[in-house]
């Protein structure tokens, strides 16, 4: 009898977890039908490139790893919205914990509260389940680039483990092509990724060629990454190029980068 009662209780909990409005899952958590705005990165890149076309100084807010810490993400967004100087926002990935469509939608709804255009990278958690398909519909390709104020931002998929080495991650053909594509429109470069070199997600068998292709970009200034949930920075390849880590939303810390004609500065914002 006691065992039967336990079974009934577990069954009731399962029903509640499936039907609860607050759950990050619906009945089909990996249903890939995406309602609402799609292809967000391409749409926002057009805005970013237009807004920054003639700017020689830009202010970029960089956030990462919001997962299901929605209140913390909302706090970061509110703080960014109070700063009129921000030109655009970069999210370095891990919008979700499980790659579910509902998680993606909940994150998108909050990011669309930003008063400035934004782009979103794909994190390793965002690849889980049918996350790759949902990300592609909602945001676009997971390797992409854009040019703002004569600076090219290269957004590199480095989530190699999630692809079980079945695809080229990082994609050196993409990097090689981007180094010269639209070369007349940019003089400097910034590389962005979710997982940094030497992390467990990165394909550390290709560290040397990765550094080679990244360093091929004209006047590479710095690199950005998330994944580790901390504020940190490293000169991974001892070549003067600093890789800046951006903290998870739960830490209520993010970075603002100011790019000027003579260089750049960065500030850690603590809420």
Model-derived segments and spans:
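C-terminal motif of bacterial Sec signal peptides marking the signal peptidase cleavage site
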Residues: 16-20
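Short acidic, glycine-rich surface-loop motifs adjacent to enzyme active sites
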Residues: 83, 179-200
């Amino acid at each position: 009898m006691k065992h039967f009662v336990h079974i009934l209780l577990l069954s009731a909990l399962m029903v509640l977890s499936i039907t609860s409005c607050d759950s990050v899952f619906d009945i089909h958590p990996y249903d890939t039908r995406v309602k609402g705005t799609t292809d967000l990165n391409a749409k926002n890149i057009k805005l970013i490139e237009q807004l920054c076309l003639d700017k020689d100084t830009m202010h970029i807010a960089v956030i990462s790893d919001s997962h299901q810490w929605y209140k913390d993400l909302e706090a970061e967004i509110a703080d960014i919205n109070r700063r009129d100087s921000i030109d655009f926002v970069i999210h370095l990935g891990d919008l979700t914990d499980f790659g579910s469509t509902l998680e993606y939608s909940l994150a998108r709804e909050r990011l669309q509260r930003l008063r400035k255009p934004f782009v979103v990278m794909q994190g390793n958690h965002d690849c889980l389940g049918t996350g790759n398909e949902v990300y592609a519909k909602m945001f676009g390709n997971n390797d992409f680039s854009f040019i703002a104020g004569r600076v090219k931002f290269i957004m590199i998929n480095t989530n190699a483990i999630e692809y079980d080495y079945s695809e080229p991650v990082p994609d050196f053909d993409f990097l090689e092509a981007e180094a010269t594509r639209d070369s007349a429109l940019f003089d400097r470069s910034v590389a962005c990724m979710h997982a940094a070199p030497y992390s467990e997600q990165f394909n550390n068998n290709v560290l040397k060629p990765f550094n080679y292709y990244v360093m091929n970009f004209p006047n590479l200034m710095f690199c950005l990454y998330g994944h580790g949930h901390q504020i940190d920075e490293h000169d991974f390849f001892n070549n003067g190029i600093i890789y800046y880590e951006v903290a998870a939303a739960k830490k209520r810390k993010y970075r603002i980068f100011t790019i000027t004609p003579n260089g750049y500065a960065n500030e850690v914002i603590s809420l």
